[in-house]
Structure formats: C-alpha cells, structure tokens
Amino acid sequence: MPKGGRKGGHKGRVRQYTSPEEIDAQLQAEKQKANEEDEQEEGGDGASGDPKKEKKSLDSDESEDEDDDYQQKRKGVEGLIDIENPNRVAQTTKKVTQLDLDGPKELSRREREEIEKQKAKERYMKMHLAGKTEQAKADLARLAIIRKQREEAARKKEEERKAKDDATLSGKRMQSLSLNK
C-alpha cells in the first residue's frame, strides 16, 4: 500500500449520461409546471377552460415523447455518440403478431458455410467417381500402369513355367531315349 493510503476511488462505474431526449423532456416538464403556477396565480376561478387546453398539450407532448421512445430507445452513451458503422446491425424487436413462422428460416453464417462445404464435397466425390477430376485422372493412369505391369509379370511367369515344363519334358525324353537304347 503506498504512503497516504489509496489514491483514487471508483473509476468509471458510477458515471451516468443522460440522453438528450430525457433532458428535453425534463425541460418541457419544468416549463409546463412554471406556466401552470403562473396561470393559477393570475386567475383562480376563471381559468377553468385553460387547464383543459394544458391537458391536451400535455397529452400531445407525452405522445410525442412516447413516439420518440418507441422509435429509438438508446441506453447509456449511444444517444450522445452517432454511430456510423456500416457493419453494425440494429436488432429490432418484433411482436408476436409480426413474426413470420411460415417463411424460410435464415441460417447463421457458420451453418450456411457448413452446408456449402458439404455440398461442395459431395459434388467433388461425384466428379471423382466419374473420373472427371485431375486427381481421379491421375489415379486411373496410375492404375493402368500397375495393370500393365501385372500383366507383363503374369506373362513372364507363364513363359518361365512353359520353359520349365519344356525343359523337364525334353529332359524326360532324353532319359527315355537313353533307356530305349
């Protein structure tokens, strides 16, 4: 702990910004209260028609405030700072009556990419099985070379076996000829 105790207190947790709409609403409410007090002081009984007009004006002001709140309800510093981020998506809340359950469900980016990846893989496998991809062509060429090598090896084996059989037959003939003498 440094000398003199702790310095500084809470940094920014207690800061609260008032939105311009709230400030305007407070100013209008104060003006209306001041007007009402002035009118009450000036004419007590004869001002029965005026409060009705004031109530109408109050109702219209409240409806305007409600419209403003309905259009854009900003929290914290958002009301003070204009955000110009084109990538920012404003999430709008929908009522139950506005929900479209019958329409196609929009997939997230990851889900879409996963489906596209699977489709691309399936397309590639079909092309590969049909022998239309470069890898399939290379595989088929390699298989053809191996097939030729095996055929040649089988042919050589057959020739060697025939040669061996001929040698054994010729050897037996020699023996039989020598025995006949």
From Swiss-Prot:
<dbReference type="GO" id="GO:0048008">
    <property type="term" value="P:platelet-derived growth factor receptor signaling pathway"/>
</dbReference>
<feature type="modified residue" description="Phosphoserine">
    <location>
        <position position="19"/>
    </location>
</feature>
<feature type="modified residue" description="Phosphoserine">
    <location>
        <position position="60"/>
    </location>
</feature>
<dbReference type="InterPro" id="IPR019380">
    <property type="entry name" value="Casein_kinase_sb_PP28"/>
</dbReference>
<keyword id="KW-1017">Isopeptide bond</keyword>
<feature type="cross-link" description="Glycyl lysine isopeptide (Lys-Gly) (interchain with G-Cter in SUMO2)">
    <location>
        <position position="52"/>
    </location>
</feature>
<feature type="modified residue" description="N6-acetyllysine">
    <location>
        <position position="132"/>
    </location>
</feature>
<feature type="modified residue" description="N6-acetyllysine">
    <location>
        <position position="164"/>
    </location>
</feature>
<feature type="region of interest" description="Disordered">
    <location>
        <begin position="1"/>
        <end position="118"/>
    </location>
</feature>
<keyword id="KW-0007">Acetylation</keyword>
<feature type="compositionally biased region" description="Acidic residues">
    <location>
        <begin position="60"/>
        <end position="69"/>
    </location>
</feature>
<feature type="compositionally biased region" description="Basic residues">
    <location>
        <begin position="1"/>
        <end position="14"/>
    </location>
</feature>
<feature type="compositionally biased region" description="Basic and acidic residues">
    <location>
        <begin position="151"/>
        <end position="167"/>
    </location>
</feature>
<protein>
    <recommendedName>
        <fullName>28 kDa heat- and acid-stable phosphoprotein</fullName>
    </recommendedName>
</protein>
<feature type="compositionally biased region" description="Basic and acidic residues">
    <location>
        <begin position="50"/>
        <end position="59"/>
    </location>
</feature>
<feature type="modified residue" description="Phosphoserine">
    <location>
        <position position="176"/>
    </location>
</feature>
<dbReference type="GO" id="GO:0048407">
    <property type="term" value="F:platelet-derived growth factor binding"/>
</dbReference>
<feature type="modified residue" description="Phosphoserine">
    <location>
        <position position="63"/>
    </location>
</feature>
<dbReference type="GO" id="GO:0005829">
    <property type="term" value="C:cytosol"/>
</dbReference>
<keyword id="KW-0488">Methylation</keyword>
<dbReference type="GO" id="GO:0005615">
    <property type="term" value="C:extracellular space"/>
</dbReference>
<feature type="modified residue" description="Phosphothreonine">
    <location>
        <position position="18"/>
    </location>
</feature>
<feature type="modified residue" description="Phosphoserine">
    <location>
        <position position="57"/>
    </location>
</feature>
<feature type="compositionally biased region" description="Basic and acidic residues">
    <location>
        <begin position="102"/>
        <end position="118"/>
    </location>
</feature>
<feature type="modified residue" description="Phosphoserine">
    <location>
        <position position="178"/>
    </location>
</feature>
<comment type="similarity">
    <text>Belongs to the PDAP1 family.</text>
</comment>
<feature type="region of interest" description="Disordered">
    <location>
        <begin position="151"/>
        <end position="181"/>
    </location>
</feature>
<keyword id="KW-0597">Phosphoprotein</keyword>
<feature type="modified residue" description="N6-methyllysine">
    <location>
        <position position="126"/>
    </location>
</feature>
<dbReference type="InterPro" id="IPR039876">
    <property type="entry name" value="HAP28"/>
</dbReference>
<dbReference type="Pfam" id="PF10252">
    <property type="entry name" value="PP28"/>
</dbReference>
<dbReference type="GO" id="GO:0005886">
    <property type="term" value="C:plasma membrane"/>
</dbReference>
<keyword id="KW-0832">Ubl conjugation</keyword>
<feature type="modified residue" description="Phosphotyrosine">
    <location>
        <position position="70"/>
    </location>
</feature>
